[in-house]
């Protein structure tokens, strides 16, 4: 790649790193083409970009972004997974792939909210429920008091109606 191409790639990756909610680095040594394609397809479904970029170019691209915390990890074969939406979904796919493959695909590090995170932190992130599940749980928690209040309000007239009905049945029986 010539100097112009490298400059263009650095600019493109810099823009992506600035927009990203989270970035994960992995050592892809030992992956064959089939495994790489499978991983890319799974990551694409989770709206995650997966690229292999030279470490020196990654280091240049990360300058001026909150992803500079990853600079110490730019060593050896490095693949970068960039997510603009849900960091949990990306962590789930990467962690699952690292567990299921027989090759030594390993997570190196990541950055979330401008802070570097370890492979153990990435695994902890992967163990969280998905964003949709967390939102549903939160909405359920917020809705529960209102639902209970409506139930109590509905119970009072219902009890009154049942009492009147019992009195009516009692009087009809006499």
Swiss-Prot record:
GO terms for molecular function: large ribosomal subunit rRNA binding; structural constituent of ribosome. One of its GO terms (biological process) is translation. Pfam families: Ribosomal_L10. InterPro entries: Ribosomal_uL10, Ribosomal_uL10-like_sf, Ribosomal_uL10_bac, Ribosomal_uL10_bac_type, Ribosomal_uL10_CS_bac. One of its GO terms (cellular component) is large ribosomal subunit. PANTHER family: 39S RIBOSOMAL PROTEIN L10, MITOCHONDRIAL. Part of the ribosomal stalk of the 50S ribosomal subunit. The N-terminus interacts with L11 and the large rRNA to form the base of the stalk. The C-terminus forms an elongated spine to which L12 dimers bind in a sequential fashion forming a multimeric L10(L12)X complex. Belongs to the universal ribosomal protein uL10 family. NCBIfam families: PRK00099.1-1. This is Large ribosomal subunit protein uL10. The lineage of its organism: Bacteria, Pseudomonadati, Thermodesulfobacteriota, Desulfuromonadia, Geobacterales.
